[in-house]
Design a protein with these regions (language model features):
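Short cationic amphipathic helices and targeting signals
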Residues: 45-47, 245, 257, 264, ...
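Catalytic metal-binding acidic patch
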Residues: 29-64, 81-83, 232, 245
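Extended, alpha-helical interaction "stalks"
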Residues: 287-288, 295, 300-301, 310-314, ...
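N-terminal regions immediately upstream of nucleotidyltransferase
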Residues: 1-6, 174-192, 201-203, 321, ...
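Conserved NTP/Mg2+-binding pocket subregion across the NTase superfamily
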Residues: 1-7, 62-162, 205-323
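Helical scaffold of the NTase/Pol beta-like nucleotidyltransferase catalytic core
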Residues: 1-26, 399
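Hydrophobic alpha-helical positions that pack around
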Residues: 330-334
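Extended, basic/helix-rich recognition subdomains
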Residues: 148-198, 338, 346
Length: 399
């Protein structure tokens, strides 16, 4: 079945490879590793486009490329995510996220164009912790909400892989879930695996237990909470409506809010990891009750890393290629514009007034309009912000 998917990916790459704009196209993730479930797996591509040129920053060319992708998706609906980088951006991303870099270096399959150099670097612990947070916030909560047994098992395996990498039990992330399961079965966490494989509904308990172990190795212990905490919030930095559901511990019953649209399910320990290793901006809208548990605010360095992670320039090309929303890039430019003066002064940025981004969210353009009219401006400002953020990170590291 992997041969069928790879053939479909190759044909898609041939259609999308439009020189001189599109320079390289890779298959990555499940198609590249051969871990295919027919009718369920998506075709995910990694595309390198040329370095943006002129005042338009290749916005019209990206709009045209998006149009080709829309046409192609009519015939190949499995073609879901196309992650688009420019040459300078892919180098930055591979240096910024060594976890993903390790996986791409060992599995990405060139389908069209010239090869990219994937650096062979050690996986940083902080990148593995952040990847665990990405899986829990972005995918695990969705699997719980949908009661999707396959995705509960899948995300729990990926979370253990990130956990084991962060704990130093494996030197680099596994590439397939059978490999993860085999390594897990050999580890000291093996007693958690059998219940998960027999009954994926135990995944929340397993994930929360792993998060507590990881938290204990990285951050001060938190005071216990007696009952679930539920809060509706506009979650920065992308300002999407979410329901934050914090359950006391790994064996807690899940409240009904955990199954509602937009839920974000966690324990206090998992939320603390998320705040310090992935999304420091959450402190702007975090319920006050959490500070009573001993959750500490993120540092200036953690805010800088958060800006670099969320503000990498490939996210400017997410609209249409990765996700349907077109407003997040401009919103995050506004977030960084607000934060930079405080970070330069060595201060934690205060909360951004949501009214400053409300206009972007309300007036979301179509992807073609975004690339022709908005992208050139956000691209130029993003590049200027990136230079400042890198200088800040180097200064903080040297001090």
């Amino acid at each position: 079945m992997s041969g069928f998917y790879r053939a479909a990916a190759t044909l898609s790459a041939r259609f999308l490879h439009v020189p001189p704009v599109a320079e390289s196209i890779y298959a990555h993730r499940s198609v590249a590793t051969g871990e295919i479930s027919f009718g369920r797996s998506d075709i995910d591509l990694l595309m390198i486009v040329r370095q943006p040129r002129g005042d338009a920053a290749d916005g019209p060319e990206l709009a045209s490329l998006y149009g080709r992708l829309c046409w192609l998706r009519r015939f190949n609906p499995a073609l879901s995510h196309v992650e688009v980088h420019d040459p300078a951006g892919i180098r930055r991303w591979l240096e910024l996220d060594t976890y993903r870099s390790s996986q791409e270096r060992r599995s990405a399959m060139l389908l069209r164009g010239k090869p990219v150099c994937f650096p062979d670097v050690a996986v940083r612990r902080e990148d593995a912790v952040r990847r665990l947070c990405v899986w829990t916030e972005g995918f695990f909560s969705t699997a719980v909400r949908e009661r999707n047994r396959r995705n509960l098992r899948k995300t729990a395996l990926e979370i253990w892989c990130a956990f084991a990498t962060a704990m130093g039990r494996i030197p680099q992330p596994c590439l397939t879930r059978p490999e993860i399961a085999a390594r897990w079965a050999e580890s000291e966490d093996a007693p958690l695996l059998d219940p998960l494989l027999r009954d994926p509904s135990t995944a929340p308990s397993v994930v929360f237990r792993l998060a507590k172990r990881l938290h204990g190795s990285l951050l001060p212990p938190l005071r216990p909470v007696s009952q679930p905490l539920v809060a509706q919030l506009l979650m920065p930095p992308r300002y999407r409506q979410r329901i934050l559901v914090v359950v006391p511990e790994e064996n807690s019953s899940l409240p009904r809010e955990a199954f509602q649209p937009g839920s974000c399910l966690c324990t206090p320990e998992l939320l603390d990891l998320y705040l310090h290793y992935m999304n420091p901006f959450l402190v702007w809208s975090c319920p006050q009750q959490l500070t009573g548990l001993g959750v500490q605010p993120p540092s200036v360095a953690e805010f800088v890393r958060g800006c670099l992670f969320y503000g990498h320039n490939h996210t400017l090309r997410n609209p249409g290629f990765m996700y349907r929303h077109t407003w997040p890039p401009a919103v995050f430019i506004e977030v960084v514009r607000h934060a930079l003066p405080y970070l330069h002064a060595g201060e934690i940025p205060p909360p951004l007034d949501p009214r400053r981004v409300a206009g972007w969210i309300a007036g979301s353009p179509s992807p073609c309009e975004y690339y022709r009219s908005v992208f050139p401006h956000v691209y130029r400002e993003s590049e200027e912000q990136w230079i400042q953020l890198q200088e800040l990170e180097e200064r903080l590291r040297s001090s």
